[in-house]
Swiss-Prot record:
LRRNT domain span: 34-61, 271-307, 496-532, 716-752
Keyword line: Developmental protein, Differentiation, Disulfide bond, EGF-like domain, Glycoprotein, Leucine-rich repeat, Neurogenesis, Repeat, Secreted, Signal
Species of the source: Rattus norvegicus (Rat)
Domain of life: Eukaryota
Location relative to the cell: Secreted
Gene3D superfamilies: 2.60.120.200, Laminin, Ribonuclease Inhibitor
This protein's GO CC annotations: extracellular space
SUPFAM superfamilies associated with the record: Concanavalin A-like lectins/glucanases (SSF49899), EGF/Laminin (SSF57196), Growth factor receptor domain (SSF57184), L domain-like (SSF52058)
The protein, known as: Slit homolog 3 protein
InterPro entries (alphabetical): ConA-like_dom_sf, Cys-rich_flank_reg_C, Cys_knot_C, EGF-like_Ca-bd_dom, EGF-like_dom, EGF-type_Asp/Asn_hydroxyl_site, EGF_Ca-bd_CS, Growth_fac_rcpt_cys_sf
PANTHER family referenced in this protein's UniProt entry, alphabetically: SLIT HOMOLOG, SLIT HOMOLOG 3 PROTEIN
Signal peptide: 1-33
Length: 1523
């Protein structure tokens, strides 16, 4: 037997043994350990918030609770929860789950609670929960579910709480809830439900909570049952509103009368819906059982497609794999097209169960191997296209079930041989394509030549690639004897039937036996396909710079030697040598390696010789050679090693020779260990020598004494490896995330092999130039930065870049060569910038681009942008979002749909648009400055002499700015630091004349006078008794010409002035005041007091006498009035009533002596009255009477922790209580109080309730509050207004909150039945006056204030005159209405005519009254016009003179606010939204929306909150099947 054959047989046996070992491991008992990163406690497993993308493996079988919320899980498979038979609680909320495979919960028999809310589910598979009979709570809210199929909840008969709110549900199939007999809570709010079948809730006897609000309910005859059903159950289904038809929009379903629920035309049963028809993926289109997802950028096979599909088209996407059972549920599928994707991995059972499949198209992918059994069971398959892949092997039984196959294409693959018998099962084959494969025409392919000669079905012209003697010859034309085998060919191909075949010699290489010599070929990377038999691989003298981790050595089990010498290798990636356990010799001599780490040699466990000579290595770390326990020879000769970390060679247990010569070793304290190691180990080393310090130079390291290895100062070990991830970022494999870090530049330490780089949300102003050095990048996210400009060739080195995100920056201009070199780019996002133009040719290199985002840019759509519109239309690379902003004729038009001929140039372009790509065109540099473009600042100005600043607007001639103060003169001077000098006027000094010298430093003021500095002088302020310029003259105030004392007072001179001695009866400093001695007079009996000098005189009334009129006349006691000794206050008059004195109070006052002010009139703008807080208790009764003719104002206000206000609002009384711990509550009076009359208002606070009573009517209550209102404890009570300094700060203000004061009268304010006294009125400026005089003038009418002290009267009917005190006559007395009724209008009247008459006096006969009897309206009602002519008012959907024409299906735009119910608050959009209402006839079909889109709107709620929600807007109406 040949040696080669023996070796191959051993390899096969080794693989079989390995497979058996793996099978035994996999079949063993599962580990009970906790999944990685998760936390396990008892029977609970917590994996929440770990960023997981899939359900982790290894979940303990005894788990009862599993938390997987707040991760990034996208798919739930059938295997994820296998064996978890004890699980009771499962949390999957807040993930990205879009697919749940059927049977995913089949083992969860004990499951009680399942949360799947806040995911991306669009389809709810039928029978998903049939194996969870104990489920009681199921939360599916906040997903994207579109329909509820009939069998969705089969099996969960015990569920009590089902939450389906905040989805996109528009269809609920009949019987969907039939199994839910124990259901108590059902939430369906915030969906798109328009119809609900009458049987939907019949089987829910225990239902106590039902939420249906915020849907699109169409209230026609089919929904009448729901109105009755809700009226019988008033506590559930609250806020359920009609949204159509238009005349019922906004009405509560329960409140609409049954007669209003009508259907147009004949009707019987409600139209049924099909939930499966709604399960079309959002990126695809579905019609006629065909799903079309072509060119949608999909990365995986869409799940939950309509079950009845017969064809799916997935070509031209980015799908990389086909998972197990991807199409198993689509039993009717006949055609699958997944061509032109990136598929490299296909599960063996990907097409399982597709017995009806006739066509399978897989061409244009990256398939290298067909898994065993992939096509098994496809008995109906007729067309199979596998061309344009990378298939290098086909097992002999690959096509064993394809008896009906007609056409098979294997064109353009990597097949070198085909096993005999591969095509034997193909009994119906008619066409076979095998060309463009590198066939090795040896003895193993002889059968194919015979087969093709007998069956001439190969039509593509398959040819031999090797050996050379048969190269390029057609296989079908070569004679059988030409197919011969050499030794290597036999070794290579004999196991081809099981895909153990080997490859031919790589291009540019030479193969001799098992030696593959690829040296000196200028290769930049290791060839991707090498023969399996290779033992010696020679790659020396090439241009390889980086050794990638491609896994190439895993395919070379026989490899023993690798020569990579004399390349340009700078980096060896981790895992580059994985699978090279059999390699014994590795040559890396003569490269450019600078650093080494243990991961770079991973996989070389059998290595014996390692040559690293002549590199740039500077240090050797203690993990550099980890795992190389078999190395015997290590050469580090001729490097730049200065230090070696202790223990660097410890793992080299087999080492016998090490070459460390020609290295600049620094023999400091860190190298002491090496001397000891060399002396201790008997090893050949060549005696490496020290180069530093100087006194140890050229001394062998092993000869240096231990005390001579010293460190001076801070000599750190230089072998500390730099981190592979910047400290501001996080790195996972080759993905680097530096988002929202406030970065201004690219962080240092970026891994060279980074493939995805996220830099969004930083402060970058330009694309970092360093990015061009990272050539492996496939994705760059630079969104939400401040990048304002791109430069040409910015990304030209990034040949692998497929996604570039530049959205939400400040980009103003796109240079024509900005994207040159990006031939692999598929996604370019320029969304949300300031781009107005894109030069033609900018996208010439973007040959792979499939998606371009240009939305939210102010595009200027003239002729220069015509090319872009054509380019977009040609490839549909822009999804129809980008709109034109200018010129005006193109505003708001889509680039995708606007006809090309509309892109025209008319007149000059706005300079602000042109300047975006050349800011200098807008002449930003002033004062003759020179402008030049700048990539960051947009432009830069070079200023002329004497100007500076960004725009050259700051003058350097500082005299222009008048720097000299106080009138100083400026002179330019180069010798001064500031370039100028000042000539100061007298009295000032300093560089800018800013200093006024103190002239008081040397003054002549006398007698302790005060000196006051002036400008170049000073003044003396004299003390008392002194005068003169210098205060040197004495003053005598008592000389006659200076005596100031009055009324003959005596002047007395003092040292510091004078004083006056007053005569009796006078006072004051100068005796200027005549004292009023009547202030405390003793005159009696109403005598008049007359003041005199130092006394007073009493003038007695008639009959009285005495000094104080104390003697009455004779008989006076019999004539004394009771009022004589009774004093009335505030100008009241005393009268005698029943022999008792009584005060007749003026308006506004009350009390026995009119001492209390109980009525005040508020006439000022900011008037108010303040009552002390002590007057109000937490439980209080406040009452008052109000008279006003104003609509709004503040009656009462109390501001503290729980603000309370009693307001006049639109003529009604409004009570507002605004607790800071809960939403504000409001109640309004039914009565109006703005008629000028007095109305009683009462506020009662008791037992956590607030009640409002107006005019003794029915109380209005705010209901039970959370706590007792804390009114009146810490702050005052304001009536009629508030101080301007206070404001309504404590109350949450709204658009309807009146901030103005009250204008009118407030009378009899009582707090806890105690009448309040307003005596302590504010100052008159506040506009509060006693009484309410203006309201008592008009006898039979209402007072209206026209000025501060003036009123006019508005009389009641039947009264007239200025004061409404004259009785008016009835104007209808003696009226002249002939055939009608007289109606009085003030002082006149009008005639209301009877039917058949007209005219001012109803004296003209009208013959048009019966005109409608002969005028027929088919679909409307007849009316008479102002001219007496009949006309038809048509029903919606009809037109014509007689409403006989049915309108075509058209959309009518209605602008109105969209309403939502959020908990107990009513919410509406901030502005009116255009809504399209479809009206018109469609015959047997229905007029319905056929095109719509979703837009985001802001909703504002009555509780003060707001939120943003996507709302579906209809764009086009048409006829379609009724649903």
């Amino acid at each position: 037997m040949a040696p080669g054959r023996t070796g191959a047989g051993a390899a096969v046996r080794a693989r079989l043994a390995l497979a058996l070992a793996l099978a035994s491991i996999l079949s063993g008992p599962p580990a009970a350990a906790c999944p990685t990163k998760c936390t396990c406690s008892a029977a609970s497993v917590d994996c929440h918030g770990l960023g997981l993308r899939a359900v982790p493996r290894g979940i303990p079988r005894n788990a009862e609770r599993l938390d997987l919320d707040r991760n990034n899980i996208t798919r739930i498979t059938k295997m994820d929860f296998t064996g978890l038979k004890n699980l009771r609680v499962l949390h999957l909320e807040d993930n990205q789950v879009s697919v749940i495979e059927r049977g995913a919960f089949q083992d969860l028999k004990q499951l009680e609670r399942l949360r799947l809310n806040k995911n991306k589910l669009q389809v709810l598979p039928e029978l998903l929960f049939q194996s969870t009979p104990k489920l009681t709570r199921l939360d599916l809210s906040e997903n994207q579910i579109q329909g509820i199929p009939r069998k969705a909840f089969r099996g969960v008969t015990g569920v009590k709480n089902l939450q389906l709110d905040n989805n996109h549900i528009s269809c609920i199939e009949d019987g969907a809830f039939r199994a839910l007999r124990d259901l108590e809570i059902l939430t369906l709010n915030n969906n798109n439900i328009s119809r609900i079948l009458v049987t939907s809730f019949n089987h829910m006897p225990k239902i106590r909570t039902l939420r249906l609000h915020s849907n699109h309910l169409y209230c026609d005859c089919h929904l009448a049952w729901l109105s009755d059903w809700l009226r019988q159950r008033r506590t559930i289904g609250q806020f359920t509103l009609c949204m159509a038809p238009v005349h019922l929009r906004g009405f509560s379903v329960a409140d609409v009368q049954k007669k209003e629920y009508v259907c147009p035309g004949p009707h019987s049963e409600a139209p049924a819906c099909n939930a499966n028809s709604l399960s079309c993926p959002s990126a695809c289109s579905c019609s006629n059982n065909i799903v079309d997802c072509r060119g949608k950028g999909l990365t995986e096979i869409p799940a939950n497609l309509p079950e009845g599909i017969v064809e799916i088209r997935l070509e031209q996407n980015s799908i990389k794999s086909i998972p197990a059972g991807a199409f198993i549920q689509y039993k009717k599928l006949k055609r699958i097209d997944i061509s032109k994707n990136q598929i490299s991995d296909i599960a063996p059972d990907a097409f399982q169960g597709l017995k009806s499949l006739t066509s399978l198209v897989l061409y244009g992918n990256k398939i290298t191997e067909i898994p065993k059994g992939l096509f098994d069971g496809l008995v109906s398959l007729q067309l199979l296209l596998l061309n344009a892949n990378k298939i290098n092997c086909l097992r002999v039984n690959t096509f064993q079930d394809l008896q009906n196959l007609n056409l098979l294409s294997l064109y353009d693959n990597k097949l070198q041989t085909i096993s005999k018998g591969l095509f034997a099962p193909l009994q119906s084959i008619q066409t076979l394509h095998l060309a463009q494969n590198p066939f090795v025409c040896d003895c193993h392919l002889k059968w194919l030549a015979d087969y093709l000669q007998d069956n001439p079905i190969e039509t593509s012209g398959a040819r031999c690639s090797s050996p050379r003697r048969l190269a390029n010859k057609r296989i079908s034309q070569i004679k059988s004897k030409k197919f011969r085998c050499s030794g290597s060919e036999d070794y290579r191909n004999r196991f081809s039937s099981e895909c153990f075949m080997d490859l031919v010699c790589p291009e540019k290489c030479r193969c001799e036996g098992t030696i593959v010599d690829c040296s000196n070929q200028k290769l930049s990377r290791i060839p991707s396909h090498l023969p399996e038999y290779t033992t010696d691989l020679r790659l020396n003298d090439n241009d390889i710079a980086v050794l990638e981790a491609t896994g190439i050595f895993k395919k070379l089990p026989n490899l023993r030697k690798i020569n990579l010498s004399n390349n340009r290798i700078k980096e060896v990636r981790e895992g580059a040598f994985d699978g090279a356990a059999g390699v014994q010799e590795l040559m890396l001599t003569g490269n450019q390696l600078e650093t080494m780490h243990g991961r770079m040699f991973r996989g070389l466990s059998g290595l014996k010789t390692l040559m690293l000579r002549s590199n740039l290595i500077s240090c050797v770390n203690n993990d550099t050679f980890a795992g190389l326990s078999s190395v015997r020879l290590l050469s580090l000769y001729d490097n730049r090693i200065t230090t070696i970390s202790p223990g660097a060679f410890t793992t080299l247990v087999s080492l016998s020779t090490i070459n460390l010569l020609s290295n600049p070793f620094n023999c400091n304290c860190h190298m002491a260990w090496l001397g000891r190691w060399l002396r201790k180990r008997r090893i050949v080393s060549g005696n490496p020598r020290c180069q530093k310090p100087f006194f140890l130079k050229e001394i062998p390291i092993q000869d240096v004494a231990i005390q001579d290895f010293t460190c001076e100062g801070n000599e750190e070990n230089s072998c500390q490896l730099s981190p592979r991830c910047p400290e501001q970022c996080t790195c996972v494999e080759t993905v680097v995330r530096c988002s929202n870090r406030g970065l201004h530049t690219l962080p240092k330490g970026m891994p060279k092999d980074v493939t995805e780089l996220y830099l969004e949300g930083n402060h970058l102003t330009a694309v970092p130039k360093e990015l061009s050095t990272f050539r492996q990048l496939t994705l760059i996210d630079l969104s939400n930065n401040s990048i304002s400009m791109l430069t040409n060739h910015t990304f030209s080195n990034m040949s692998h870049l497929s996604t570039l995100i530049l959205s939400y920056n400040r980009l103003r201009c796109i240079p024509v060569h900005a994207f040159n070199g990006l031939r692999s780019l598929r996604v370019l996002t320029l969304h949300g910038n300031d781009i107005s133009s894109v030069p033609e040719g900018s996208f010439n290199d973007l040959t792979s681009l499939s998606h371009l985002a240009l939305g939210i840019n102010p595009l200027h759509c003239d002729c220069s942008l015509r090319w872009l519109s054509e380019w977009i239309k040609a490839g549909y690379k822009e999804p129809g979002i980008a709109r034109c902003s200018s010129p005006e004729s193109m505003a708001d038009r889509l680039l995708l749909t606007t006809p090309t001929h509309r892109f025209q140039c008319k007149g000059p372009v706005d300079i602000n648009i042109v300047a975006k790509c050349n800011a200098c065109l807008s002449s930003p540099c002033k004062n003759n400055g020179t402008c030049s473009q700048d990539p960051v600042e947009q432009y830069r100005c070079t200023c002329p002499y004497s100007y500076k600043g960004k725009d050259c607007t700051v003058p350097i001639n500082t005299c222009v700015q008048n720097p000299c103060q106080h009138g100083g003169t400026c002179h330019l001077s180069e010798s001064h630091r500031d370039g100028f000098s000042c000539s100061c006027p007298l009295g000032f000094e300093g560089q800018r004349c800013e200093i006024n010298p103190d002239d008081c430093e040397d003054n002549d003021c006398e007698n302790s006078a005060t000196c006051v500095d002036g400008i170049n002088n000073y003044a003396c302020v004299c003390p008392p008794n002194y005068t003169g310029e210098l205060c040197d003259e004495v003053i005598d105030y008592c000389v006659p010409e200076m005596n100031l004392c009055q009324h003959e007072a005596k002047c007395i001179s003092l040292d510091k002035g004078f004083r006056c001695e007053c005569v009796p009866g006078y006072s004051g400093k100068l005796c200027e005041t005549d004292n009023d001695d009547c202030v405390a007079h003793k005159c009696r009996h109403g005598a008049q007091c007359v003041d005199a000098v130092n006394g007073y005189t009493c003038i007695c009334p008639q009959g009285f006498s005495g000094l104080f009129c104390e003697h009455p006349p004779p008989m006076v006691l019999l004539q004394t009035s009771p009022c004589d000794q009774y004093e009335c206050q505030n100008g009241a008059q005393c009268i005698v009533v029943q022999q008792e004195p009584t005060c007749r109070c003026p308006p506004g006052f009350a009390g026995p002596r009119c001492e209390k002010l109980i009525t005040v009139n508020f006439v000022g703008k900011d008037s108010y009255v303040e009552l002390a807080s002590a007057k109000v208790r937490p439980q209080a009764n406040i009452s008052l009477q109000v008279a006003t003719d104003k609509d709004n104002g503040i009656l009462l206000y109390k501001g503290d922790n729980d603000p309370l206000a009693l307001e006049l609002y639109q003529g009604h009384v409004r009570l507002v209580y605004d607790s800071l711990s809960s939403p504000p509550t409001t109640v309004y009076s039914v009565e109006t109080v703005n008629d000028g009359q007095f109305h009683s208002v009462e506020l009662v606070m008791l037992n956590q309730t607030l009640n409002l009573v107006v005019d003794k009517g029915a109380p209005k209550s705010l209901g039970k509050l959370q706590k007792q209102p804390a009114v009146g404890i810490n702050s005052p009570l304001y009536l009629g207004g508030i101080p301007t300094s206070t404001g309504l700060s404590a109350l949450r203000q709204g658009a309807d909150r009146p901030l103005g004061g009250f204008h009118g009268c407030i009378h009899e304010v009582r707090i806890n039945n105690e009448l309040q006294d307003f005596k302590a009125l504010p100052p008159q400026s506040l506009g509060v006056s006693p009484g309410c005089k203006s309201c008592t003038v008009c006898r039979h009418g209402l007072c209206r204030s026209v000025e501060k002290d003036s009123v006019v009267c508005e009389c009641h009917p039947g009264w007239t005159g200025p004061l409404c005190d004259q009785e008016a006559q009835d104007p209808c007395l003696g009226h002249s209405c002939s055939h009608g009724t007289c109606v009085a209008t003030g002082n006149s009247y009008v005639c209301k005519c009877a039917e058949g008459y007209e005219g001012p006096l109803c004296d003209q006969k009208n013959d048009s009254a019966n005109a409608c009897s002969a005028f027929k309206c088919h679909h409307g009602q007849c009316h008479i016009s102002d001219r007496g002519e009949p006309y038809c008012l048509c029903q919606p959907g009809f037109s014509g003179n007689h409403c006989e024409q049915e309108n075509p299906c058209l959309g009518e735009i209605v602008r109105e606010a969209i309403r939502r119910q959020k908990d107990y608050a009513s919410c509406a959009t901030a502005s009116k939204v255009p809504i399209m209402v479809c009206r018109g006839g469609c015959g047997s079909q229905c007029c319905q929306p056929i095109r719509s889109k979703r837009r985001k709107y802001v909703f504002q709620c009555t509780d003060g909150s707001s939120f943003v929600e996507e709302v579906e807007r209809h764009l086009e109406c048409g006829c379609r099947e009724c649903s």
